[in-house]
UniProtKB/Swiss-Prot annotation:
InterPro entries: NAD-cap_RNA_hydrolase_NudC, NudC-like_C, NUDIX_hydrolase-like_dom_sf, NUDIX_hydrolase_CS, NUDIX_hydrolase_dom, RNA_Hydrolase_NudC, Znr_NADH_PPase
Keywords, alphabetical: Hydrolase, Magnesium, Manganese, Metal-binding, NAD, Zinc
Binding site residues for a divalent metal cation 2: E176
Disulfide linkage: none
Ranges for domain Nudix hydrolase: 127-251
Nudix box (motif): residue ranges: 161-182
Origin species: Photorhabdus laumondii subsp. laumondii (strain DSM 15139 / CIP 105565 / TT01) (Photorhabdus luminescens subsp. laumondii)
Higher taxonomy: Bacteria, Pseudomonadati, Pseudomonadota, Gammaproteobacteria, Enterobacterales
Quaternary structure and partners: Homodimer.
Cofactor: Mg(2+); Mn(2+); Zn(2+)
Gene Ontology MF, one: RNA NAD-cap (NMN-forming) hydrolase activity
The protein's name in its UniProt record: NAD-capped RNA hydrolase NudC
Keyword Manganese set for record: yes
Length: 257
């Protein structure tokens, strides 16, 4: 059962306080401990999981200060970051689904799943999840890295993009790589996936080998793109990200070439 409840003050665990895709990080980290320690008694909370044997609670509220982007804890423990991402996405889902998009009546939270229900027209809404592909591309002992327009700060990463309607994951990889870098790839293989709450993506990761073409990056998407020798890389994404894993997996392949 996924029932909201009013906090009495005796509850203990991790506290995700979120509003408009931002999260409360007092002292720069997720609050942990008794509800009274964080003055949360009387708030309405929803249990959304467990971490290290402790409940994870979601409270949808804007705090006076220390409301920041979830990106601030990307490099923290992967499991905890994933739960925090779930909390932020659920908070935004419930905030944006207060009324039915079909009939305009008030929505109600399901107690058996993450969903909103309309008791008037019986419509049911679920959190939106956007499928994305991300791919590490190797050319001998080099890896293709790009600086994205939305990655200001000098970080270089692998290519990625959203899957379009009626498109397979494999087709999406081939299309995105061609659109963003003008090269063709081969030997495409699936690696892993990672929920990515910016804002509500599911990243599906692949590795591929270079086939043909010269890099010509799309200036609408990328600031630059180039081949980098595996032991002379620029600033890359932090640990616990699927992009970092693809880069590290490609480095291993380069060393074994």
């Amino acid at each position: 059962m996924m029932m909201q409840q009013q906090i009495t003050g005796t509850e203990h665990g991790w506290w995700i306080i979120s509003n408009e895709n931002r999260i409360w990080l007092p002292k720069g980290e997720l609050p942990f401990g008794m509800a009274t320690q964080w003055s949360l008694q009387g708030k309405i909370a929803l249990p959304i999981g467990e971490w290290q044997g402790e409940k994870v609670w979601l409270i949808r509220q804007k705090m006076v200060s220390n409301m920041v982007s979830l990106r601030q804890i990307v490099a923290s423990d992967r499991g905890l970051f994933q739960l925090a991402g779930r909390g932020v996405q659920l908070a935004e889902f419930y905030r944006s689904h207060q009324y039915c998009g079909y009939c305009g009546n008030e929505m109600h939270h399901s107690v058996s799943e993450w969903a909103c229900l309309c008791h008037h027209c019986h419509e049911r809404y679920y959190p939106q999840i956007a499928p994305c592909i991300i791919v590490g591309i190797r050319r001998d002992d080099h890896i293709l890295l790009a600086q994205h327009q939305h990655h200001r700060g000098g970080v270089y990463t692998v290519l990625a993009g959203f899957v379009e309607v009626g498109e397979t994951l494999e087709e999406a990889v081939v299309r995105e790589v061609m659109e963003e870098s003008n090269i063709k790839i081969r030997n495409l293989r699936y690696v892993a996936s990672q929920p990515w709450p910016f804002p509500h993506s599911l990243m599906m990761a692949f590795l591929a080998d270079y086939d043909s073409g010269e890099i010509r990056h799309d200036p609408q998407e990328l600031i630059s793109a180039d081949w980098y020798h595996y032991d002379q890389l620029p600033l890359i994404p932090p640990h616990n990200t699927i992009a970092r894993r693809l880069i590290e997996d490609t480095i291993v392949l380069c060393r074994n070439t």
